[in-house]
Regions:
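Active-site pocket-lining/capping segments in soluble small-molecule metabolic enzymes
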Residues: 1-116, 136-137, 143-300
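As written
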Residues: 131-132
């Protein structure tokens, strides 16, 4: 068995995602969520959760910011609200959320998603043994390493299978500083059209700025059609699509294609090649599935 999850932009996406075979819909909140696709109020999340449950789907909320001491009380209050709403899952990055959720008897809803930190079985098992629902493996490890970890871990593991990967976060508002240095005014709010280019590379790396700072993403779009069956066979049951930089229609179609591959209706390799042709400007890639991030390029 496997489950597909993806973030939504608006409540109208829920029926669309249901029809595409997505099992869990992620919601983001202002202040609490890093790099959101769409942002929702608590009232909208409550409404969305009820609709999802009617459709036999699950709701998840991203509490993925790092909390300072003065912000922990707001985190506790939000956790209490989400518990009352009967939200199914809560993604977290800061372990303060784990402690607060423990005090509120809701650890079983948590999914630990620290981006790069879960790189071995001991890491994953430690957090799962705290009684949380699941752990997201680092997106910078290889497929072979993911399979090796899954063979040793008892509990729910999640892997990000598709989309642009976050590669850098700074609390500083770097884009604002850049445009101030240039003496130019520029609307940066919800602007997903900016990118960086290295002098010696052709890749476009998306860069965004929000209330949590500046975020830079990979110059490629991860595409794992040819890998997902091996991951599921190894015991990884939760597969997530990164919705950012995709429309909700694209997210839904991508989910359909993954489900077709996983259920044997389409070839993973053929689907990967089709996406390369369909999205020539997105640098469709297997990412780090076969390439260690520690690999050093040597000029010959």
């Amino acid at each position: 068995m496997f489950e597909l999850s993806a973030a939504s932009y608006e409540l109208a996406d829920i029926k669309k995602y249901h029809d595409a075979g997505i099992n869990t819909v992620l919601f983001a909140l202002p202040f609490f969520s890093a790099r959101p696709a769409g942002v929702f109020t608590n009232q909208q999340i409550e409404e969305g959760t009820k609709l999802l449950h009617e459709l036999n789907m699950k709701s998840a909320v991203q509490l993925t910011r790092f909390f300072t001491e003065s912000e922990c009380e707001a985190c506790r209050d939000e956790l209490q609200l989400l518990k009352a709403m009967n939200v199914d899952q809560i993604y977290f990055t800061d372990c303060a959320v784990l402690q607060l959720a423990d005090e509120l008897a809701m650890k079983d809803k948590l999914i630990y998603n620290p981006d790069t930190l879960i790189t071995n079985a001991a890491d994953a098992q430690f957090y799962l043994d705290q009684g949380i629902h699941g752990v997201t493996l680092s997106k910078e490890i290889t497929k072979e390493e993911m399979i090796d970890i899954a063979a040793q871990v008892k509990g729910n593991l999640e892997v990000l299978i598709h989309g642009r990967l976050n590669m850098m976060h700074s609390k500083r508002r770097l884009l604002t500083s850049y445009y101030e240095f240039l003496g130019r005014e520029f609307d940066l709010e919800n602007n997903h059209d900016l990118y960086l280019m290295e002098e010696n590379r052709d890749e476009h790396m998306p860069i965004i700025e929000d209330e949590l700072g500046t975020h830079v993403f990979t110059g490629f779009t991860l595409c794992s059609f040819n890998e997902v069956n091996d991951l599921v066979k190894a015991g990884i049951q939760s597969l997530r699509i990164e919705s950012l930089f995709m429309s909700s229609d694209e997210v839904a179609q991508t989910a359909r294609d993954y489900r077709d591959v996983l259920e044997g209706r389409k070839s993973g390799l053929e689907m990967f090649e089709a996406y390369q042709k369909q999205y020539p400007n997105q640098n469709i890639s297997t990412g780090f599935m076969y390439k260690k991030t520690s690999t050093v390029k040597v000029n010959v």
